[in-house]
A protein has these predicted regions:
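A short, N-terminal "cap"/entry segment at the start of jelly-roll beta-barrel domains
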Residues: 1-54
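Hydrophobic packing within well-folded, soluble alpha/beta domains
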Residues: 2-6, 16, 82, 114, ...
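Ligand-binding loop in jelly-roll beta-barrel domains
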Residues: 41, 99-100, 108-133
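Short acidic-glycine-tyrosine-enriched beta hairpin
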Residues: 46, 92-108
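Short, conserved beta-strand element in jelly-roll/cupin
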Residues: 61-62, 72-89
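Short histidine-centered beta-strand/loop micro-motifs
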Residues: 68-74, 115-117
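Structural motif
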Residues: 79, 86-88, 95, 111, ...
Length: 133
């Protein structure tokens, strides 16, 4: 019978026929959360529920001659795409220069920091895994 098949699948009739909740796929600005630090740098969580997932995408604006807080080594990886301006990505003692239209990717095994050496705000998409913020 159908109930025997459901039992063989290791579930109950209620769970078998329960409609699954649809995951949100599209996120709009109304759901974004923003944090602005003392220097005026902005971090926007563009997928507000990202803590539940494996990646955490952020929209970040770093003000001229400012930097984000230094991050300690951790398990995970970080990726960024610079939309406007330019950044220095500092991994340990090494400095990498990244300009608009370029991306960066690194394992987060060293102390790392992102700074804006330019005269204009730098805007970039930043994705970390696992979620950090």
């Amino acid at each position: 019978t159908l109930l025997d098949l459901i039992e063989c699948l290791g579930t109950t009739a209620a769970d078998f026929f329960k409609e699954t909740e649809e995951e949100q796929v599209v996120f709009s600005e109304q759901g974004y959360f923003e944090k602005i630090d003392e220097a005026g740098n902005s971090i926007q969580w563009i997928v507000p529920t990202a803590q539940r997932y494996r990646m955490e995408p952020l929209l970040v604006v770093v003000q001229p001659h400012q930097s984000l807080e230094e991050d300690k080594p951790h398990d995970g990886e970080e990726f960024g795409y610079v939309m406007s301006g330019r950044l220095n990505v500092i991994l340990g003692e090494q400095i990498y220069h990244v300009k608009a239209g370029e991306s960066f990717y690194y394992p987060a095994k060293k102390i790392h920091r992102i700074e804006n050496p330019g005269q204009r705000p730098a805007k970039f998409i930043w994705v970390s895994t696992p979620p950090m913020f």
